[in-house]
């Protein structure tokens, strides 16, 4: 056998090993200098034919010492030496004169191969070891497991000679611990394993990679502190560790990496201060540390980084000021310090960085103004100062930024006008100045910015008209001036904007007629203005119009022909106008999804053709003058999901064909004249969630088939003529089993059968209504006892059984009913005494009405002092004993009782000074009892009283003087007491000696006569007193009016008594006329846990710094949110609504009614409304303050790294349940209308809570109204309404789908063309929207690449992500009917949260590492 030379193999790269025919073997020539490689081949030696895993690959080289024809390669490879290996076959030794030369060459060959042999053999073994360690990636590393592929030809492996110099396994989903075999390749120069899903910690043996220059470990799950050995790799030039879970402090040893040009460690959990040693890296060009937990100030040593081009430190906890030494970074191109805690002014030195192209300082605690020197940054393309607490005026020098493309200055507190110099920004494409504090007029110079595509000036105080010069902005796509004070006509020239797709002019003071609209307009919103006249037909001259919102104006005329040309119209919202005529039939031919004609003057019958529409999902025709019957044709509208025709004049029976509407979820026909029995076919609509047929003339029994409506959670049949017994089958729909898909902590279930003629007993099966929250059976003919089974309803908050014929005890159950807040049992035949332990049985009781029964005994001690009780009525009973006003001495908190009526009983004894402890009492009625003694002066210290009736008792003595100073008191009656005296407050004022003389009940006139002089003096004195009294009264009345303007009561929504206290009072205390006794105002406190909190406007002003921008924490579609700390230390969020005083003009009760409804919403995934205020034109809402900010902040500006997949999935599930509760669980159902990540707030433990639903359009039950409607947010708007807001539940579903995609991808809902250029071509797909981009990627088979690279996921978690992505894509379907309901979304996400992990089903490829400068 010819001599063999063993060669350790490192897989040659394709460039070094050529096919046999080409004879390229240049990489192997060096060891054979002066010789010629004449051929090569591959051998495969195994111990058996089936043992393929132990195959070894050999290189066969055929050489010839002398020049000449190459030796022929053998037909078969020789047997391997030693059971395998690689070899070189040499020709046999010559027999002639070349023998000496032959042996010399052979010796030289051996010397050259000896060092390479050992190294190559080691690398080959390491490659096979590495392959074994990552065998899970066999499906992605195909040629690693192909026998015919040399190791150096394996994908991602690069060799020089036979030595491995580069490993690139990026975007290969392996999901194993970091393979230690990698560190065995000692000649490695480049290592890229980004996006491999590696976990664990880096080994200290990293020090072995002494030749490493490029290290990319991004997009994995690696954690722990960085090993100290990493900083000994002194040849390292690029280190990329983004999107991992590394923690600990950044070691000062980083100063050893003096060759470093790129350091990118973003989106980890590094903490502590930035080491000053970073400033010693003189070659550093790219530094990215964003989204970590670095704290402290920016080291001054950073000024040494003179070569730095890119510095991104956003989303950390950096404090201090922006260091002045930053001026030394003369080559800086991008600076991003956003979302930190930086303070102080923007340093002027920053404006010396002449190469700066992008400056992002948003979301910091900066102060001062934008420096005048900002105009020196001539290369600036992006200036983002959003939410920086900046004040003063915007400098004129802003106009010097000639190539600026994006200017973002929203959510600041600028003063004055937007400078005219902004018109010099001829390259400006986006101007975002929302809620920035600007006043004055919109600068006409903006018309020079002809490249503008986005102009957002909403939420300011701009006045005047829209400048004519803006007509030149023909490139504009989005124009938003909502929520200002703009006036005048909407200009006609807007129809010349050929590229605009969305125009929002809502909530201004525009008047006059509607103009024509641009041809390519998709969305037009002009609600809440003063537009008048008829709607012109030319409004439909464009063929792209999909959404038209003109509600809350003064539009008149009919719509007989108006919208015939709107061939793509999907939403038409005309509510709250003065339109008349009949509803036209052509509406059925339009692709409408939502039609809202409520609150107009439409007459006639509902056209039958409307029921033939193939697209419509929601119809609202409430509050018109429609007549006739609902015909059987309604059964043709199979797609219908919601129908509301409340408060019209419809007659006749409900059509039987309504049972064909199997998709119907909400049916509300209250306030009509419908008659006859409820058709049994109605109960075929098995998706019904809300059924409201109240306020009609329906007769007959409640059908037992109601049990078929298993999804029902709202049933309102009140104010009809229904008779018979309450069917026990009713509770099938309200059982936990029927609603198991929505695991609400607080369920919502409403049964309202009040004001009918129902008889019999309350069914004992009521305990099966386990999701029931409110039960209203008042005003019927029910008999028997209160069923003890009510105590099993653990979620019940309100029970109203008043005005029936119930007998027996008040509380038949001894166990606590912790959730019950309102119990109304008045006007029955209940007997016995009030249990002494009632406070323990009803621990959360807020309203207790036991009046009009036959109760005896005494009032339990401490009942009046119970911390939760606001309203107590025990009038018209036979209760005796003393009224227990005295509380325990250790009670320090204010007594929350607001309303107390104990009249017409047998109470005795006297009132003592302890009544002064009831500082919140507004209504006190104790008339017709046997109370004795003197009236305590302490009663005058209950300054909140406005109704006081102590008549028909046995009081004696005087009326306390202090009562005359109770300016809030509007009714007081002391008549019918001892000695027959009849005294009113007018008597108090008219008594001798001034306002408060000793006016005893038994007082008699003096006997002695007056002398003439004395009489004269007395008359003069009396006249002076009268004049002074008149002056005092005028002063006090004016002061009182001022106080009314300045003071309000923070009312837990639902508290009508307190709301009535806010209304203007018609009588003053000094008795200009005597008020007649009136019924106490109705109140509803039953759904609130806390007593009202009294604050004044002044206190709110102080708490918000006079609504200073520094207190702004956000801005919603209808107002600005301020952080405030009330007296007593409670932190709240105060939402100051924009321009809604006019909206509720003449209807404060309407505003209150809406807030009453919203205030009842309580769910752990919703931000609760604590109170509200209507003071003049101001409207304030007070919410619980959420310390941890919003989901948007966490994902893009405040800690996204802290949100791993488990946290994101929990947020997704919780938010879904909150929205599902609004859609399906609360009555009246609430459509959010502005679902977005900034409206998902994070509470303790990152518990998600959906906010801003309090301003959503409310679809109410019997006594509802139509309320304000929020505008949606760009990027979250469903396609059927283009860039505007939706008013259907399916619109909320679409928006929530976008939020789900944000959670999955970490991307914003939209991005600009400038951002696309920065990111790369992949970002162009989808047209700049997140939904479009996900579809674009999926269509190209790259769906697995959409996930956020920073998500720390395992294989099982990746499957969860894939399933959530499926749900999100269903939610964002173009067709609304293809989208699931929120109930279904919550169920599916809940199932994903609880899923058992199966095999990995989705392969994920992360994106490329960040581009290096």
UniProtKB/Swiss-Prot annotation:
It is a single-pass type I membrane protein. It catalyses: L-seryl-[protein] + ATP = O-phospho-L-seryl-[protein] + ADP + H(+); L-threonyl-[protein] + ATP = O-phospho-L-threonyl-[protein] + ADP + H(+). Keywords: ATP-binding, Cell membrane, Glycoprotein, Kinase, Leucine-rich repeat, Membrane, Nucleotide-binding, Receptor, Repeat, Serine/threonine-protein kinase, Signal, Transferase, Transmembrane, Transmembrane helix. CDD domains: STKc_IRAK. The active site is at residue 1234. GO terms for molecular function: ATP binding; protein serine kinase activity; protein serine/threonine kinase activity. LRR repeats lie at residues 185-209, 210-233, 235-257, 258-281, 282-304, 306-329, 330-353, 354-377, 379-401, 402-425, 427-449, 450-473, 475-497, 498-518, 519-542, 543-565, 567-589, 590-613, 615-636, 637-661, 662-685, 687-709, 710-733, 745-769, 771-793, 794-817, 818-841, 843-866, 868-890, 918-942, 944-966. This is Leucine-rich repeat receptor protein kinase MSL1. The lineage of its organism: Eukaryota, Viridiplantae, Streptophyta, Embryophyta, Tracheophyta. The gene is MSL1.
């Amino acid at each position: 056998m010819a001599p063999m030379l063993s060669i350790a193999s490192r897989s040659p790269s394709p460039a070094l090993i050529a096919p046999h025919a080409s004879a390229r073997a240049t990489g192997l020539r060096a060891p054979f200098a002066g010789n010629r490689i004449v051929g090569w081949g591959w051998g495969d030696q195994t111990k058996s034919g089936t043992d393929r895993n132990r195959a070894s690959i050999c290189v066969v080289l055929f050489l010839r010492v002398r020049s000449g024809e190459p030796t022929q390669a053998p037909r078969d490879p020789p047997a391997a030496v030693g059971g395998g290996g690689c070899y070189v076959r040499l020709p046999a030794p010559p027999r002639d004169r070349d023998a000496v030369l032959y042996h010399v060459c052979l010796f030289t060959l051996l010397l050259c191969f000896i060092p390479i042999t050992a190294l190559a053999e080691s690398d080959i073994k390491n490659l096979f070891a590495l392959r074994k360690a990552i065998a899970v990636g066999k499906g992605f590393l195909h040629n690693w497991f192909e026998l015919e592929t040399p190791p150096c030809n394996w994908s991602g492996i690069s060799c020089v000679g036979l030595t491995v110099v580069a490993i690139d396994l990026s975007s290969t989903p392996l999901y194993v611990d970091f393979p230690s075999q990698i560190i065995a390749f000692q000649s490695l120069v480049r290592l890229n394993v980004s996006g491999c899903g590696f976990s664990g910690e880096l080994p200290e043996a990293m020090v072995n990679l002494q030749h490493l220059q490029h290290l990319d470990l991004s997009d994995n799950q690696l954690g722990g502190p960085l090993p100290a050995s990493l900083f000994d790799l002194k040849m390292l030039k690029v280190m990329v560790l983004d999107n991992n879970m590394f923690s600990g402090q950044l070691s000062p040893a980083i100063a050893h990496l003096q060759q470093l040009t790129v350091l990118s460690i973003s989106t980890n959990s590094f903490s502590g201060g930035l080491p000053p040693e970073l400033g010693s890296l003189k070659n550093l060009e790219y530094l990215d540390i964003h989204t970590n937990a670095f704290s402290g100030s920016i080291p001054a040593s950073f000024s040494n980084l003179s070569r730095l081009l890119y510095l991104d430190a956003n989303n950390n906890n950096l404090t201090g000021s922006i260091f002045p030494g930053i001026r030394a970074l003369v080559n800086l191109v991008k600076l991003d310090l956003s979302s930190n805690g930086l303070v102080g002014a923007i340093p002027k030195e920053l404006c010396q960085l002449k190469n700066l192209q992008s400056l992002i300082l948003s979301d910091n605690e900066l102060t001062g103004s934008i420096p005048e020197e900002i105009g020196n940054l001539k290369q600036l393309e992006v200036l983002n100062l959003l939410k920086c607490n900046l004040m003063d005026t915007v400098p004129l020098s802003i106009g010097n930024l000639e190539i600026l493309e994006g200017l973002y200055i929203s959510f600041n507190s600028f003063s004055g006008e937007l400078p005219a110099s902004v018109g010099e920004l001829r390259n400006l494409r986006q101007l975002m100045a929302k809620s920035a504090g600007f006043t004055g007029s919109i600068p006409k110079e903006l018309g020079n910015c002809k490249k503008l595509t986005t102009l957002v000036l909403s939420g300011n105080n701009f006045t005047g008209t829209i400048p004519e010069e803006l007509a030149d902005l023909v490139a504009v796509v989005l124009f938003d001036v909502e929520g200002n004070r703009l006036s005048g006509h909407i200009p006609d020239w807007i129809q010349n904007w050929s590229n605009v797709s969305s125009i929002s002019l809502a909530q201004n003071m525009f008047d006059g007629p509607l103009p024509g609209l641009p041809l390519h307009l998709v969305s037009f919103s002009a609600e809440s203005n003063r537009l008048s006249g008829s709607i012109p037909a030319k409004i439909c001259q464009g063929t792209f119009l999909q959404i038209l919102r003109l509600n809350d104006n003064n539009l008149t005329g009919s719509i007989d022909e108006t919208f015939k040309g709107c061939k793509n119209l999907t939403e038409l919202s005309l509510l709250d106008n003065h339109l008349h005529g009949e509803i036209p039939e052509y509406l059925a031919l339009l692709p409408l999804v939502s039609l809202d004609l409520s609150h107009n003057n439409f007459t006639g019958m509902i056209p039958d053709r409307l029921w033939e529409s193939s697209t419509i999902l929601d119809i609202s025709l409430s509050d018109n003058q429609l007549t006739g019957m609902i015909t059987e044709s309604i059964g043709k509208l199979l797609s219908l999901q919601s129908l509301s025709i409340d408060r019209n004049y419809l007659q006749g029976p409900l059509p039987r064909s309504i049972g064909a509407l199997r998709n119907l979820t909400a049916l509300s026909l209250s306030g009509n004249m419908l008659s006859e029995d409820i058709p049994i076919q109605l109960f075929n609509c098995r998706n019904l969630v809300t059924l409201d047929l109240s306020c009609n003339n329906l007769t007959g029994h409640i059908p037992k088939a109601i049990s078929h409506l298993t999804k029902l959670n709202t049933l309102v049949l009140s104010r009809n003529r229904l008779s018979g017994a309450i069917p026990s089958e009713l509770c099938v729909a309200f059982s936990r089993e029927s609603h198991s898909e929505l695991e609400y902590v607080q369920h919502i279930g409403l049964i309202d059968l009040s004001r009918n003629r129902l008889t019999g007993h309350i069914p004992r099966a009521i305990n099966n209504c386990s999701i029931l929250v409110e039960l209203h059976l008042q005003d019927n003919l029910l008999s028997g006892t209160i069923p003890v089974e009510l105590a099993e309803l653990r979620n019940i908050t309100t029970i109203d059984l008043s005005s029936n014929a119930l007998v027996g005890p008040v509380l038949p159950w001894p166990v606590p009913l912790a959730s019950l807040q309102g119990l109304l049992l008045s006007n029955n035949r209940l007997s016995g005494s009030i249990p002494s332990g009632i406070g323990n049985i009803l621990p959360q009781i807020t309203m207790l009405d036991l009046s009009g029964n036959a109760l005896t005994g005494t009032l339990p001690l401490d009942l009046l002092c119970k911390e939760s009780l606001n309203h107590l009525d025990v009038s018209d009973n036979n209760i005796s004993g003393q009224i227990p006003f005295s509380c325990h001495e250790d009670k320090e908190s204010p007594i929350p009782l607001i309303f107390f009526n104990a009249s017409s009983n047998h109470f005795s004894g006297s009132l003592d000074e302890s009544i002064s402890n009831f500082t919140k009492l507004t209504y006190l009625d104790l008339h017709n009892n046997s109370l004795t003694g003197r009236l305590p002066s302490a009663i005058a210290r209950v300054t909140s009283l406005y109704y006081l009736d102590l008549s028909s008792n046995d009081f004696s003595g005087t009326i306390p003087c202090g009562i005359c100073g109770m300016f809030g008191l509007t009714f007081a009656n002391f008549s019918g007491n001892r000695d027959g005296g009849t005294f009113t407050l007018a008597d108090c004022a008219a008594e001798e000696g001034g306002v408060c003389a000793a006016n005893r009940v038994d007082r008699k006139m003096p006997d002695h006569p007056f002398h003439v002089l004395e009489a004269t003096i007395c008359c003069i004195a009396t006249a002076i007193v009268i004049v002074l009294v008149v002056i005092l009264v005028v002063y006090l009345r004016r002061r009182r009016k001022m106080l009314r303007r300045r003071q309000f009561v923070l009312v837990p929504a639902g508290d009508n008594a307190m709301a009535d206290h806010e209304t203007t009072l018609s009588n003053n205390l000094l008795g200009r006329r005597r008020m007649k006794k009136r019924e106490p105002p109705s109140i509803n406190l039953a759904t609130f846990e806390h007593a009202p909190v009294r604050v004044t406007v002044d206190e709110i002003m102080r708490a918000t710094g006079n609504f200073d921008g520094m207190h702004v924490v956000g801005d919603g579609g209808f107002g600005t949110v301020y952080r405030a700390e009330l007296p007593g230390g409670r932190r709240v969020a105060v939402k100051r609504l924009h321009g809604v005083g006019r909206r509720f003009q003449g209807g404060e009760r309407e505003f209150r009614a809406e807030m009453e409804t919203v205030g009842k919403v309580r769910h752990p995934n919703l931000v609760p409304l604590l109170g509200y205020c209507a003071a003049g034109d101001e409207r304030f809402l007070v919410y619980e303050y959420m310390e941890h900010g919003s989901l948007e902040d966490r994902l893009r500006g405040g800690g996204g790294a802290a949100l791993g997949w488990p946290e994101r999935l929990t947020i997704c599930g919780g938010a879904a349940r909150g929205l599902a509760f609004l859609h399906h669980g609360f009555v009246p159902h609430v459509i959010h209308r502005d679902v977005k990540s900034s409206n998902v707030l994070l509470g303790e433990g990152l518990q998600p809570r959906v906010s801003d639903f309090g301003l959503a359009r409310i679809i109410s039950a019997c006594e509802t109204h139509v309320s304000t409607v929020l505008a949606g947010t760009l990027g979250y708007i469903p396609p059927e309404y283009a860039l505007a807001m939706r008013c259907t539940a399916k619109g909320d579903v679409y928006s929530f789908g976008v939020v789900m995609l944000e959670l999955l991808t970490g991307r914003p809902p939209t991005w600009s063309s400038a951002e696309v250029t920065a990111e790369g071509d992949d970002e162009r797909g989808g047209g700049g929207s997140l939904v479009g981009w996900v579809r674009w990627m999926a269509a190209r088979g790259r769906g697995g690449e959409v996930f956020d690279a920073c998500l720390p996921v395992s294989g099982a978690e990746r499957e969860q992500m894939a399933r959530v992505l499926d749900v999100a894509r269903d939610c964002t379907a173009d067709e609304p009917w293809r989208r699931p309901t929120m109930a279904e979304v919550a169920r599916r996400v809940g199932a994903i949260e609880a899923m058992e992990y199966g095999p990995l089903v989705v392969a994920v490829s992360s994106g490329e590492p960040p581009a290096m400068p």
